[in-house]
Amino acid sequence: MNSNLLNTPIDYLKGLGASRSQIIKKELNIFDYKDLANFFPKRYLDKSKYYKIKDLPKFSCDVQIIGEISNITEIGLGRKKRLVAYFFDGEDEIELIWFKSIKWLKKSLTLNTKYIIFGKLSFFANKVSIPHPELELFKSENLKLRAKLQPIYPSTETLIKKGVSNKVISNLVKILLFEIKIKFKETIPDYLINELKLLDKNSAIYNVHFPENNELLSESIRRLKFEELLFLQLQLLKKNIYRKDKIKGYNFNIVGNNFNKFYNEVLSFELTNAQKKVLKEIRNDLGSKAQMNRLLQGDVGSGKTIIAFMTILIALDNGYQTCLMAPTEILSVQHYEGFLLMAKLLNINIVLLTGSTKDSIKKAIYKSLESGEVDIIIGTHSLIQDKVKFKNLGLAIIDEQHKFGVAQRSKLWAKSTTPPHILIMTATPIPRTLAMSAYGDLDISLIDELPPGRREITTVHRYDNNRLSVFAFIRDQINEGRQVYVVYPLIEESKNMDFKDLMDGYESLSREFEQPKYQISIVHGKMKAQDKEFEMKRFENEETQILIATTVIEVGVNIPNASVMIIESSERFGLSQLHQLRGRVGRGIHKSYCILMSGSKLSNESKLRIKTMTETNNGFLIAEKDLEIRGPGDIMGTQQSGVITLKIADLISDQEILIYARKCAKKILTDDKDLLNSKNSKLLKTYNHISKNKDLWSYIG
């Protein structure tokens, strides 16, 4: 069957009609036969079981009954009007109730005619009924068909209102598969199908819509999920191979004076085994003559920054400049100040460039950067401006890169004739499956060990009506010489109200902790950069005991004496944000605490987030739970979500299939990196199609 048939517009499907066709196109993005065939059910109903009314369960669930309508009556007036039919199975009776389409139903339903009804039991005022049941005229030949699993397709409110029911969609797919009998070209080679005992493509498509049995359904879903994840991994791994083969990088083969002096004379502690392992991986990349593209992951406080600095020293020892780009000015300043202390000991020239840098200083930086006098530049997105020119940029480090767009990162990479080595750092732990998908084209290093002596933070949840006891705890901590963060949410959609909450909180704390005994700093987005920096400095120098802030302190702030993090309206933060904020304390020798404040009314999702925070300090466990709650698109944001748009596979529930698909993709490309072997011809055709069209499911051979 040729591919033109699969490209046939759905308008030509028997019984669809122009009006419904337009609605389906608009609501479901189904435009042609292949789109409809690849519109997979979201779940299945088992309609093989029939109940007698006397044996119905005593709880709300789906049931199916065979019987006759013995009586029909209208009850109530206006909005309370409803149609009630009494359904008799030969022994007992149950009420069927409809609140909509009453006139049409009254004409359509026939007394003393045998029907099969299907619906959810409802219990109200000691009476059991079935609201809005599905009805079908009883035909003995239909019993065999109904014994199979029934597909339930994704829908929308508009579709339901316009009469495009699940039954309509299901019937359209039936016409497509059993009357028109469309066929798909196979995408997976025979040797893989045989080796992995996979169903062929067409059997999988047919059985995912209308499974013969549970076993075939499982095999069909497994086949289609594996296919989707295999081609995702082939794309990502081939991209990685291409970079290593074709994109040559600077060869940093010297470990010289800067690195050795720092390691032997300046570094005052032993690196963890995890840090040593990661440093070795980076050094291997830098000496491979290919461009490094590595993601460095590590939980809060795991020691990523020191690894970044040591990587910079290798670049400097080989005669190249480096840059570090961070998403916020506060984080840029923190990196600069931390690096400056170490750089001075090594006589390294380091500068800071942000939006608030004075014009005269900017001009001097531009000049010395282009001449090669500057060794390291740290900054925000200011680094990607056209005015910023390097003499020989050899290494670019990007911190919290998910907060930058692709275009911003590309501009940074373009500042060198030979692509600089790229090290991406994140303190936002990324679940393994998400890392394999969103960052599957990068090499990944993981610091999965905290330095010795790092103490766990005690996290508790307190309701707003416990505020006085929380104030008492803050006072005790301050009297012991500690400092306290109090963080408020600031969300764009409600920023005016959030700003008011922040200022109300400041006034409340000012009344409770009066001057001159207590000093309070406040930092928020409406302040000028220099004012923020001034208040942060006061807190860092222990001139103030309490810092009230919005999430501008989410990453990068390092105050070892701060031992308490109070997060107001904690139910409004995501898990990742809560974990990052908690990571601002516990950086010194003192026992530290995180207190999650909230109102008394919490959604189930909020309760789950708060419970997770109180039960673990492990950022990777938290990331897995966050993925489970929010899904991959929300976690990565719109800039990243495109790479993980999946039609049938799921990054949360299909981890085993994803890991296996990546393993298979690696083996295939190890043996045949360009997919030129004749046995991989199907893979190559499909891969080329995806590369061009960005969509596996539009491939029809």
Question: Where are the model-predicted features located?
Answer:
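Conserved pre-motif I regulatory segment
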Residues: 22-23, 249-296
